[in-house]
């Protein structure tokens, strides 16, 4: 069974686990303690199935963004934790207890830090508003199929056999009430998220820009990205947030605060098929912006992993023309020369990299 479909069955199993764990809790108030316990159980299942990427560069980056956003909130019910999941599906979600998960697929399609920050701010909004607790508390008004639909909408996404199975099961028992709850939650998470984003200093339009990118993916591929499957009402959300930006958040913000997203993306571990797909994506982007230093660097790193050393060196040299004192570019050229046995050139570039180390 391919890893993608296998992961979908794991998610499905976790949803069943959540249903079982909450069946008794549903009869009473779903407390902060209950949320912490459920969130921890979900996290441990992800760890057990090796679905979390333990990559310091990636984790530090999203945690830095998350903490910057959390500094703008007046009250948070949880101690938040941020993780990258080893999934190429373009998705993100928050589980009970303040656990925020970003799929590596989403990390790779975001065009700048502000767009990624918008996704994280939205998920923090879900957690702070305790939307999963609200779903479970309302479950007395829903049958089990409708509750499964809502939990699947929060956590699953991504297509595949498991997604199709849970969707078919869920729709059979869901109702307009289910959809209304989900749309209300999305609107509240957007309202909270864009406020967090602005006060953190980011460009508020980035949230809308990311949704438009997802709509473009849907148009080009004829399939709906996981993020749109699990975050309904996209067109309405775009209109709503555009209105907020025009009336309340007109001040410009920054697209990058913590660090250069494009350089961070180069640290995302990819399978052979993912490397080839990423190479095509970067080549398409570079055709539109051939002098972009970050795109040249990122493409070179992919080519290096694919064994295309000559192409990698060519793109690094082009990047160096644009940014002659760039530490990472100089170091990468030196290491590439070292790998191919050009020791004198390697020494030269590595010494230059050392001198340029910020």
Task: Put a short name on every predicted segment.
Residues 11-22:
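Bacterial N-terminal signal peptides
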Residues 141-159, 165-177:
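Membrane-active amphipathic alpha-helices enriched in small hydrophobic residues
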Residues 114, 124-141:
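Catalytic Zn2+-binding segment of zinc metalloproteases
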Residues 84-98:
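Catalytic zinc-binding patch centered on the HExxH motif and its immediate surroundings
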Residues 104-118:
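Short pre-active-site segment immediately N-terminal to the catalytic Zn-binding motif
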Residues 40, 52-54, 60, 176-328, ...:
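Extracytoplasmic and endomembrane cell-envelope/extracellular-matrix remodeling and assembly machinery
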Residues 102, 118-126, 130, 189:
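Active-site recognition of the HExxH zinc-binding catalytic motif
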Residues 26-30:
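Boundary at the C-terminal end of the N-terminal hydrophobic targeting segment
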């Amino acid at each position: 069974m391919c890893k993608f479909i296998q992961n979908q069955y794991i998610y499905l199993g976790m949803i069943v686990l959540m249903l079982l764990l909450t069946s008794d809790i549903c009869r009473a108030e779903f407390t902060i303690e209950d949320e912490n316990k459920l969130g921890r159980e979900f996290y441990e299942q992800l760890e057990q199935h090796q679905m979390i990427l333990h990559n310091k560069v990636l984790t530090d980056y999203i945690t830095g963004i998350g903490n910057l956003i959390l500094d703008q909130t007046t009250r948070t019910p949880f101690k938040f934790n941020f993780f990258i999941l080893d999934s190429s599906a373009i998705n993100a979600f928050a589980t009970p207890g303040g656990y925020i998960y970003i799929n590596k697929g989403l990390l790779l399609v975001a065009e700048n830090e502000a767009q990624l920050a918008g996704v994280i701010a939205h998920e923090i909004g879900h957690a702070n508003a305790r939307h999963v607790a609200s779903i479970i508390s309302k479950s007395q008004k829903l049958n089990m199929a409708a509750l499964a639909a809502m939990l699947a909408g929060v956590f699953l996404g991504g297509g595949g056999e498991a997604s199709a199975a849970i969707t078919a099961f869920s729709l059979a028992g869901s109702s307009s009430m289910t959809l209304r709850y989900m749309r209300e939650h999305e609107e509240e998470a957007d309202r909270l998220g864009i406020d967090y984003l602005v006060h953190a200093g980011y460009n508020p339009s980035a949230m809308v820009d990311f949704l438009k990118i997802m709509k473009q993916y849907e148009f080009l591929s004829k399939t709906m990205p996981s993020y749109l499957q699990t975050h309904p009402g996209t067109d309405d959300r775009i209109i709503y947030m555009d209105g907020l930006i025009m009336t309340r958040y007109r001040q410009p913000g920054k697209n990058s605060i913590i660090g250069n997203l494009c350089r961070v993306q180069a640290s995302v571990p990819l399978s052979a098929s993912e490397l080839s797909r990423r190479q095509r994506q970067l080549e398409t982007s570079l055709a539109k912006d051939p002098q972009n230093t970050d795109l040249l660097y990122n493409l070179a790193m992919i080519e290096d992993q694919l064994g295309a050393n000559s192409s990698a060196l060519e793109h690094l040299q082009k990047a160096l023309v644009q940014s002659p004192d760039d530490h990472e570019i100089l170091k990468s050229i030196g290491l590439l020369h070292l790998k191919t046995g050009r020791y004198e050139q390697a020494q030269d570039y590595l010494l230059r990299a050392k001198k340029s180390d910020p």
